[in-house]
A protein has these predicted regions:
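Beta-strand-rich binding/interaction modules
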Residues: 1-20, 30-33, 43-53
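Local beta-strand/beta-hairpin segments that build beta-sheet-rich folds
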Residues: 11-14, 28-32, 56-58, 167-175
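Catalytic beta-strand/loop cores that center a nucleophilic Ser/Cys/Thr
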Residues: 43, 105-107, 123-175
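Exposed aromatic-hydrophobic patches
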Residues: 26-39, 62
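Short alpha-beta junction capping motif
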Residues: 70, 75-123
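Extracellular ectodomain segments of secreted/surface proteins
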Residues: 1, 66-70
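Edge beta-strands of extracellular beta-sandwich domains
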Residues: 57-67
Length: 175
């Protein structure tokens, strides 16, 4: 059987995959699960749980669903490719700045960013790149209102983080 739930336990779907003999091994298809996603109007993290009834055998996987159409708000964020005077002025007055400087950063460019779990982080193997193991996120920040996340990176971060350029803030002012 399978269940599809959100983080609050709200059921989005469920059913049976039928009964079949399962050989010992890996990557054995249990069947096909189809779910209509069109009714989902805002981004949501879901969890698929598959269980063999009458046993303790259970496994689950997280996945994220985003609506096909979204309405964006222009907001009050200054977007720039460099930490220019306007960005500094905006920050000085408590404003918001997004720096999209990929490929233009020199300090920290020796740090190679890939989206790898700790187990496969090559820092364990002669310090070859990549040198990162993920991110730490303030998941309660208002900017994540429509982007379901936890305090750490997960698979929904793949497109945003994999092979992106690192920006090191070691010598930036603390303020």
């Amino acid at each position: 059987t399978y269940l599809i739930k959100d983080v609050n336990g709200i059921l989005y779907g469920g059913g049976s995959l039928g009964r079949k003999d399962l050989p010992i091994g890996n990557n054995i298809s249990l069947g096909c699960i189809k779910m209509d996603l069109s009714a989902i109007e805002k981004p949501v993290k879901l969890n698929l749980e598959v269980r063999i009834q009458g046993t303790d055998a259970v496994n689950d996987w997280d996945f994220w669903v985003y609506p096909a159409q979204v309405t964006t708000q222009s907001g009050d964020v200054y977007i720039t490719e460099t930490l220019d005077k306007q960005a500094l002025d905006i920050l000085e007055t408590g404003g918001k700045v997004l720096i999209t400087a990929a490929g233009k950063i020199s300090y920290g460019k020796n740090i190679v960013q890939h989206f790898t779990p700790v187990f496969w982080n090559t820092s364990w193997f002669k310090m070859r790149p990549p040198h990162t193991t993920g991110i730490w996120v303030n998941e309660h920040h208002p900017m994540f209102k429509e982007f379901p996340t936890e305090y750490h990176s997960n698979l929904q971060w793949w497109e945003l983080l994999n092979k992106t350029q690192v920006m090191q803030f070691t010598h930036f002012p603390v303020e």
